[in-house]
């Protein structure tokens, strides 16, 4: 797409959680020294803006599914938080929404990755139906990356490879 240019693009979509998730991805990439550009539907905490032109060759965007315009993106990685019956004025049925999300996930191409909420087997089935590389995350057993409490603090576990835990702290209101 025009906005991402030649940058490797991470596009975040879903009925809920797009702004939070895309903000987290952009912030993590920036703190890892990747200096991403980003365009997000809300102000990113710590940046006081919803968009930035970075120099790292990466672009993180909030992908809006409400009217199907996310199909105009050219993502390398797609993150899908959830798929629910929303925007029925445009899609008509949940089945049509799911078909459109499958088209969106298919945009990553053969060398791309789809990251999807793995606690919902139907979402995983939809993602895998595209034939793309799928990575799952969630709270339950069997996901690739699992959020679990460890010593009272949340941790993100890399399940299949057993490489260890990653500390992922959620900042709560007033903390």
Spans of model-derived segments:
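Phosphate-binding loop of NTP-binding sites
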Residues: 1-118, 122-132
């Amino acid at each position: 797409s025009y906005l991402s240019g030649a940058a490797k693009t991470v596009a975040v979509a879903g009925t809920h959680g797009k702004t939070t998730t895309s903000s987290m991805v952009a912030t993590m990439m920036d703190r890892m020294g990747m200096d991403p550009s980003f365009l997000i539907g809300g102000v990113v905490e710590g940046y006081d803006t919803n968009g930035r032109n970075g120099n790292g060759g990466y672009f993180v965007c909030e992908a809006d599914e409400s009217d199907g315009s996310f199909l105009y993106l050219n993502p390398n990685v797609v993150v899908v938080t959830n798929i629910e019956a929303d925007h029925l004025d445009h899609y008509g049925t949940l089945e049509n929404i799911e078909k459109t999300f499958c088209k969106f996930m298919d945009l990553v191409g053969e060398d791309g990755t789809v990251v999807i909420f793995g606690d919902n087997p139907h979402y995983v089935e939809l993602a895998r139906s595209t034939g793309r590389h799928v990575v799952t995350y969630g709270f339950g057993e069997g996901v690739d990356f699992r959020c679990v409490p460890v010593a009272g603090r949340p941790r993100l576990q890399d399940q299949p490879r057993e490489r260890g835990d990653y500390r992922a702290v959620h900042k709560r209101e007033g903390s």
